[in-house]
Amino acid sequence: MPKMKTNRAAAKRFKRTGTGKFMRARANKSHILTKKSPQRKRRLRQGTAVDAINVRALEHMLPYL
């Protein structure tokens, strides 16, 4: 059986933690930042875990991560 390919687009966007969760960056942090409060921009800097509903799809896209 041939090796499975890693989806390179997903590999650049998601990282796996030591406990096996997938982490992602938050949206809305690239432009139009003047109207967003400093607290909101600070929260957007931190990553967050991927929802459980999407984990199975990510495991197929990232078999070796």
Curated annotation (Swiss-Prot):
Cellular component per GO, a single term: cytosolic large ribosomal subunit
Any one GO molecular function term: structural constituent of ribosome
Keywords noted in UniProt: Ribonucleoprotein, Ribosomal protein
Lineage: superkingdom: Bacteria
GO biological process terms on file: translation
SUPFAM superfamilies in the cross-refs: L35p-like (SSF143034)
Similarity comment: Belongs to the bacterial ribosomal protein bL35 family.
HAMAP family listed in its UniProt record: Ribosomal_bL35
Protein's name according to its UniProt entry: Large ribosomal subunit protein bL35
Lineage: Bacteria, Pseudomonadati, Thermodesulfobacteriota, Syntrophobacteria, Syntrophobacterales
Gene that produces this protein: rpmI
